[in-house]
């Protein structure tokens, strides 16, 4: 049986829905020894800021049951070095490269979008709205609908013809209100979800396992939360949703598409097996054929409720 794994996202058709999640796949080059980067639907590089960042002190990762905590602190080489040294070595003509943006205020986000707007090798911009807004007392952009909407608008104005994705935080009371505000502000697509806030402690040393004390929980433990969030957001907005959270198999991919996602991102599973994203992309068409799914468009959002 012949199947069609292609997906159309705003401004870019992709060969399959399997992408990588920011912060779990480096800049893409680090994983080239484990598979063909051209086989992926998209590569979302680790968060980029205007200036290089050293990140948080060690330890920055702690294993948890069914997942992991991280407090990397968005360590990165800075956008200029990425564009000069890393982007030219990526297969951007065959696989869309999505730049994930990190900044401390809306003006900085907009400036970063402007730097990337003319780069031919960058297919889209993903905005990390879990960042604290220093001009608003440190509250995260993603925790306030008004701030989320204004940030999406500010980035969209400077993004040129680049599609803008807004990555939603699950650490909110009502993720749907944030999603709606982001779309009204100009977001072309939504990435759903970022990590959940968590912590881990050592009862013998009486110390936290992370130097930052609190970190972001990811991995299989958060998949039910991510599925619920994607389902709710897809019911509320017309913009495409990219699902992320605990995905480690082709079956997981289809679960997210079943509840409405257009595409998915593989995150923590890349630490379990560095070839995981490649394996899932290879397995997906086989699974679709086994289940009699001819194309993803007809399967998307077909969950039978009631």
Swiss-Prot record:
Residues holding substrate: 46, 70-74, 128, 194-195
Pathway: Pyrimidine metabolism; UMP biosynthesis via de novo pathway; orotate from (S)-dihydroorotate (NAD(+) route): step 1/1
Gene Ontology molecular function terms on file: dihydroorotate dehydrogenase (NAD+) activity
Subcellular location: Cytoplasm
Listed cofactors: FMN
Gene3D superfamilies referenced in this protein's UniProt entry, alphabetically: Aldolase class I (3.20.20.70)
Active site: 131 (nucleophile)
Reactions catalysed, as given in the entry: (S)-dihydroorotate + NAD(+) = orotate + NADH + H(+)
Superkingdom, taxonomy of origin: Bacteria
Binding site for FMN: 22, 46-47, 100, 128, 167, 193, 219, 245-246, 267-268
Family (UniProt): Belongs to the dihydroorotate dehydrogenase family. Type 1 subfamily.
Name of the protein in question: Dihydroorotate dehydrogenase B (NAD(+)), catalytic subunit
Organism whose genome encodes this protein: Solidesulfovibrio magneticus (strain ATCC 700980 / DSM 13731 / RS-1)
């Amino acid at each position: 049986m012949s199947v069609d794994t292609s997906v159309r996202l705003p401004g870019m058709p992709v060969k399959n829905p399997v992408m990588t999640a920011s912060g779990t796949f480096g800049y893409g080059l680090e994983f080239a020894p484990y598979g063909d980067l051209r086989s992926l639907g998209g590569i979302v590089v680790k968060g980029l800021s205007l200036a290089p960042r050293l990140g948080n002190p060690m330890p920055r990762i702690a294993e948890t049951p069914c997942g992991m905590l991280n407090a990397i602190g968005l360590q990165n080489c800075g956008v200029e070095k990425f564009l000069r040294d890393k982007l030219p070595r990526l297969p951007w003509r065959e696989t869309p490269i999505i730049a994930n943006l990190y900044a401390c205020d809306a003006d900085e986000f907009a400036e970063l979008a402007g730097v990337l707007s003319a780069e031919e090798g960058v297919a889209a911009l993903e905005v990390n709205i879990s960042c604290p807004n220093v001009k608003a007392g440190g509250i995260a952009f993603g925790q306030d609908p008004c701030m989320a909407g204004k940030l999406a608008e500010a980035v969209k104005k400077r993004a040129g013809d680049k599609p803008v994705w807004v990555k939603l935080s699950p650490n909110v009371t009502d993720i749907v209100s944030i999603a709606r505000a982001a779309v009204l502000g100009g977001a072309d697509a939504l990435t759903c979800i970022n990590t959940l806030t968590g912590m881990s402690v050592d009862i013998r040393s009486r110390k936290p396992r992370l130097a930052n004390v609190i970190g972001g929980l990811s991995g299989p433990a958060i998949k039910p939360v991510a599925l619920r969030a994607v389902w709710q957001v897809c019911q509320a907005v017309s913009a495409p949703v990219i699902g992320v959270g605990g995905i480690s198999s082709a079956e997981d991919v289809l679960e997210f598409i079943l509840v409405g996602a257009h595409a998915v991102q593989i995150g923590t599973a890349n630490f379990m097996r560095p070839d995981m994203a490649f394996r899932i992309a290879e397995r997906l068409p086989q699974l679709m054929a086994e289940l009699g799914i001819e194309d993803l468009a007809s399967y998307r959002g077909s969950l039978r409720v009631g």
